[in-house]
Amino acid sequence: MDANLRRKLDELPAEPGCYLMKDRAGEVVYVGKASSLRSRVRSYFDAGRGDQRAFVALLDGLLGDLEVIVTRSEKEAVLLENELIKKHRPRFNVRLRDDKDFIVLKLDERHPYPRLEVRRAREKRQPGARYFGPYSSASSIRETLRMVNRHFQLRTCSDHVFDHRKRPCILYQIHRCPAPCVYEVPAEEYRQSVEDAVEFLEGREGELVERLRGRMAGAAEGLRFEEAARLRDQLQAVERSLEKQRVLMSDRGDRDVIGLYREGPDLVVQVLSMRAGKLQDAQAHPFREQEFPAEEILSSFLSLYYEHTDAPDEILVPLEPVQAEALADVLSERRGRRVRLLTPQRGAKADLLDVARRNAEQGFRAWHEHDERREQALASLAKALHLARPPRWMECYDISTFQGALAVGSGVSMKDGEPDKANYRRYKVKAVAGQDDFAMLHEVVTRRLRRALGEGQLPDLIVIDGGKGQLNAALAAAKDLGVPTRPSPGNPDAPFVELVGLAKSRLVDGPALGTARVVARRGRRAEARLADAAEAAEKGFVSELARSPERVFLPGRKDPVVLRQNSAELFLLARLRDEAHRFAITFHRKLRRERNFQSVLEEIPGIGEGRKRALLRHFGALRRVREATPEEIAQVEGFGPRQAAAVHAFFHRPDAPPAAADEPSGAPEGTPAGGPAEAIPDAAIAATEAEIDAALADEDASPEPAA
């Protein structure tokens, strides 16, 4: 240990605070907290204790500097540690998924007819609103929304649509919503549905079942059979939900049970969420390179995890976390009620801890098996594509344009087989006029590689969405910048990036393929040439047309490589390519919408660029501006009654053009990176999991730096 570091250790104060350990390059590798900085930090280097823990030996060769921040209390140290971990993202601290990946259900009870909205967990919580969650997967929130909206019949439309709707939507026709937006639904009746939904979401199904049974019997006695049938369906749905939940405790309390399993530097923290004595949810959180003591890891995890979800009455933990009392105070303050951290040694609660530990071990095994399959897929991909190394860091680039207008490029990143959304980028094509995909790709790849050279980091593999022509354009960009695309024989450690092109499957025809089978809607079958099949498809037939496989083009090779269908290697590439396509087309649609918005507003006298941007930010779509009242427009930044009246009069004059057929009726599909969180469009509720993930991806990328 150098003299400067030894001096800092000798001068550490015996006060509460946080410490930041840095490596020899000055990067923060660990953040910790302590009630006494002197005691905690010196314990890592106390040779007299004969400490053989792995992290002690690790620090001796890694640590380059130490920084401490003194706080006024232990509770303040807990809060500061949380912020420092999120800011520096240290290598050896537990790091939960980015909080924008977690989603919650919000119920604004200030509205007379509230609805459930999907929100990001990091959104500032509003007074008067209730939050349920967080949900870490799209499938779980989709199932919950489907259940609640179907059986408790809460409205799904946004407040803006609610205020302006003139006739009920299809949900009213199929008896999924009472249409309070159009009809006079008694507020007390709707409020009862809201209370039922809240009890269901909070896990208090027992109370709900008893009340539903009573109301159903009352409706039947009053000969209100339609109401009784609706209540019966609600009751059956709740009872089916109860059958899926395992009762683990008889006291019907709310508690989370934390399990921890560790092998070497890798560990899994398991959270079993119990509400009213029943197991409601189970989440496994895997972490790598966790060399520090388990009590420190657990303390950091609890502080981060309960930042965006309400802590229950009790949290059962397998060991006492660092500064447990201060941590409990922080969690209680966030919740507004007392939260207890307990470490039971015997009895039913100790048995729950054992269940959580065994679940953590099972999660650990599944996590490592997944890692092994991913490693095999990357190795197989490298072998199939003749790559110099397994592509642990892959990027894919795609172009989206409409007849050469508003051309944009997208770059998505994948590390170790998982999306790396911090490195997603959007590009506006600047130097190419007209429809020239090759030149556009050349520009986008040039800008990407120029930035990579400045940062000193190159991905292992760049995948181009396209065939041989698109690949050659990207290779030319690399050559122009002097970026090697193969390892140097004389200097194997020199950086390089490999490039391939992935061409989509396509309809094919030819003598070798014979004919394509065409299946009619009513089960009839016919044989037709491919040209006839296309005509038949237009007339309502579904054609099973022959398609070529996905093809991978390699530099310097005439024929493409065809990967085995349904293989893990092809799945990795196709998943990366499809994500690049989604990201590009979403950005293109956003720009096209903004252009259409601006072109219409240019005709309004007295509305400058600043007010146009303010309208776009506030309403998001032309249709919303058309439907807005002068009072609503006046609420936009920079608008007064006079400007609001001018905008309203422009859209409601006798010769005003009708709304375009494709004019969006909801919020923009993508918001600028780092922009405010939007409610997920209602249509996403019934969509596939992939579509909901896309709806949640409005903030997944950083803006592309100026080239």
Curated annotation (Swiss-Prot):
The gene is uvrC. GO terms for biological process: nucleotide-excision repair; SOS response. It holds the Pfam family GIY-YIG. The UvrABC repair system catalyzes the recognition and processing of DNA lesions. UvrC both incises the 5' and 3' sides of the lesion. The N-terminal half is responsible for the 3' incision and the C-terminal half is responsible for the 5' incision. Residues 654-684 are annotated as: Disordered. Keywords: Cytoplasm, DNA damage, DNA excision, DNA repair, Excision nuclease, SOS response. Interacts with UvrB in an incision complex. It is found in: Cytoplasm. GO terms for molecular function: DNA binding; excinuclease ABC activity. One of its GO terms (cellular component) is excinuclease repair complex. This is UvrABC system protein C. It comes from Anaeromyxobacter dehalogenans (strain 2CP-C). It comes from the Bacteria. Belongs to the UvrC family. Residues 14-94 form the GIY-YIG domain. NCBIfam families: uvrC. Residues 206-241 form the UVR domain. Residues 658-684 have a biased composition (Low complexity).
